Design a protein with these regions (language model features):
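Hydrophobic, well-structured mid-protein blocks that either form specific transmembrane helices
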Residues: 19-63
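Acidic, serine/threonine-rich low-complexity disordered tracts
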Residues: 1-27, 63-165
Length: 165
């Protein structure tokens, strides 16, 4: 979108061991509304995101003056409701993943307890400390185990990556 990083459509399909979710949201950013497949209309603020686009949107922020402990919020529409996704900056560090060592910024998205997570601090995300701001690593504890996601390759970046030699 030429006006900004706006969400226009979201589709979610989950089928895990009998647990099923089917969600379709159409966002009308100018009118400030979200339309659901249940034919419900929800009032939302301009620039609202969904659970996936919120993380892409966060990559557009200027983190040059961010301080450890700073929290920023992104209005997010999830599971037929609006909430402010709060993301806490934990600091800068060098991390090692299979692809090498990188200068990174660590963030903790303050997640909703009880659905998947025991504690609101159970998700940790590291993004490259450069103008690309690509996700390098994510770790989370969930009610029935843990998940780890790691960058395995990258190409076509607009800027030099923060890889440590």
């Amino acid at each position: 979108d030429k006006k900004g990083v706006f969400q226009w459509y979201f589709k979610r399909r989950v089928d895990e061991g009998g647990y099923k979710i089917s969600q379709d949201y159409t966002f009308d950013q100018e009118a400030g509304e979200v339309f659901t497949q249940k034919e419900e209309t929800h009032e939302v603020p301009m620039g609202v995101q969904d659970m996936v686009s919120a993380f892409y949107f966060a990559r557009t922020f200027d983190f040059s003056d961010i301080q450890k402990g700073d929290v920023f919020e992104i209005p997010t529409f999830v599971d037929d409701e609006l909430f402010n996704l709060r993301i806490k900056f934990q600091g800068r560090e060098t991390i090692k993943i299979r692809n090498g060592k990188f200068k990174a910024m660590k963030f903790v998205p303050l997640v909703q307890e009880g659905r998947i997570w025991k504690d609101e601090n159970d998700l940790n995300v590291w993004i490259s400390d450069d103008d690309n701001k690509i996700p390098l690593l994510a770790k989370t504890k969930i009610l029935f185990g843990s998940i780890k996601m790691e960058l395995t390759e990258y190409s076509g970046l607009a800027h030099k990556i923060s890889k440590v030699r």
